[in-house]
């Protein structure tokens, strides 16, 4: 129990320290889009390495362009990374079961028609508003800081 409290306190402290890194502005649609400084595979590798280094559970990597190719459809490179911290993410779901539509965290890595690689995710403040969750501000702030830290490994 003491170790759990220590880890929780450490994660909160880390998130608050890194909050300025996660201060990316969401578009009106609630999507944060950031340019990657790297190619597609290096972006994916760097993100996955940072997720693992932070001790965050990695659930899945879905190569959407491969799925499209298997269906005979051409799609620019697009990969969805799914990860999260169940003790944190489930707190959002306990506030509103519909929040399960937005958890675990999904981070999209895609290449546009000019060859620029992007990372995109749903803004956590937008998720809170979408689900009317008003009693988890500390947790949303922490999640924002963590995703900002993760994406900072591929942005300049």
Tell me the role of every PLM-derived stretch.
Residues 41-44, 48, 65, 144-148:
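Extracytoplasmic/secreted envelope proteins and their assembly/folding machinery
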Residues 1-11:
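Bacterial N-terminal signal peptides that target proteins for export
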Residues 26-56, 153-156:
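Terminal, regulation- and interaction-focused segments at domain boundaries
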Residues 106-133:
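Beta-strand/loop substructures that line and gate deep hydrophobic ligand-binding cavities in soluble
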Residues 9-20:
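Bacterial N-terminal signal peptides
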